[in-house]
Amino acid sequence: KAIKAIKDEFDFILIDNAPALDFFTTNSIAASDYIITPVREDGFSRKGLKEILDVVNEIKDEHDLDHVKFLGTFMTQVNPRTTMVKERTLDYQKNIPDLLFHTYIRNDTKVAQMESKFVPMLEHSLESNALFDYCHLLMEMEILPDQVAQKLRCSIGEA
């Protein structure tokens, strides 16, 4: 109900949940139009993703939420130099080819520093690999404002 009251005032409302299948997650799904979930490169995340997809479908059926769509998943806390990330990416591409975003979020110590200070990434370090990756993810989702996307492209020499 709270989100319905403000929904028209925003282009996007992001709801970030703890990795749990609980009351808060259920309410977040019910309040959403689209669901995006991060996964790590470990086996637990693969199993958890399947559980999330099952729960989303159950909640949609129970509460008649046909409008809710699972938009996709992206890998986070990635060390691109490991063979595990390559194997896991191939696994996801094989099993959920239309649901895996190409952009992944690199493991970055600046994220832990930011979290320990309760400071948003944009205020902590503009040189964060994770911040750069999240911006790329938003560009891939086509939800990053044009002026921000243009600045990002200029900063990496794509403009």
List where the protein language model places each region:
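C-terminal lobe/tail of nucleotide-utilizing enzymes
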Residues: 61-159
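Generic hydrophobic alpha-helical segments
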Residues: 2-3, 17, 137, 141
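Conserved catalytic-core segment of NTP-binding enzymes
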Residues: 4-102
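P-loop/Walker-type NTP enzyme "switch/lid" segment
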Residues: 1-8, 114-116
